Amino acid sequence: VTAAEGPAGTARVPAGPFVHRETVRTATGAVHVAWTSVAAGNLALHVVPPDEAEGLARVSAARRALERVMGVPEGATLYLDQVHSADVVWADGPGRGGASAPVADAAVSRDGSRPLAVMVADCLPVVVVDETTGATAVAHAGRRGLLDGVLEATVDRLLSLRPEADRTGPGLRAWIGPGVCGRCYEVPAAMRDDAAACLPATAATTSWGTPALDLPAGAAEVLRARGVATATIDVCTREDERLFSHRRAPGEGRFAGLVWRADPDATVPRGDA
C-alpha cells in the first residue's frame, strides 16, 4: 500500500475514513481490519485537555461516526488507555473509552465479537486475527512496547485460546499498520544500538544519514519468528499527511487500527480508493 500522491508529490488526504481496509475470512465468519485516516478525525481523548468540553465532544462524535461506518452499535468499540506497556487485556466488560478504558497496550476478543481499536500517531497499530478460532487482537507497538514484548504477549494470549496441542503460529495473520519508518525515526546512536541488540532488524539510518529505528521491520521480525503470517501497510506517518504524526505535528490527534466482525448485511465503504 502506498500513499496516494497529490500536487507536487504531496500526499492526498482522502475523503473516506480509512487509509486501508481488508476483509478476512475465519472459521467463525468474516472480520474487517482497517486503519483510519485524518478524515475520520482525532479518536483519542488524551490528546484533548480534560477541561475542554468541546474538544472531548468532538472525539466522542468522531468515534460514533466511525462506528456507524463500521456498522457496529454505538459504544461497542473497545478503546484502551495506552501506556507503552506489554500488558494485554481480554476485551470483555464495558471499556467504552474515557475513565472506563482498560489500562493496557493490547486487547484480545476471544471470539472476535468485540470491535477493537488501538490509537497511534507514529507507533505501530498492529492487528492480529486467528483464522482457526475467529479470535482477534490489536496491539500498540512503540519502541518500548515492541522491545518489552507486547507482540509476543498478544500472540501468546491468542494461542492460549486454542487446544494445547495446537498452540503454534500457523493460522495467525498479522497486519503491521502505518507508523513512522526507518527513514524518519531518528534516535540517539546508543538507543539504536540497544534496540538492535534485542531486535537486529530495528537498526536503521535516516534519509539524512543519522541513527534511526525501523519499528515495522522489528515488528515483522518478532511476528514471523512466532510463525505468524505478517503483512506491512507500507505507509510512513511522518511522510503521509493522510495520517496523524506526533513527530510531524505534535498534539494534532491519533488515528486507529481496528478489527471488527463483519455484518453480512452491511456495506462498509473503502477509504483507500
Language-model regions, residue ranges each:
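Active-site microenvironment for binding and transforming phosphate-containing groups
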Residues: V1-A273
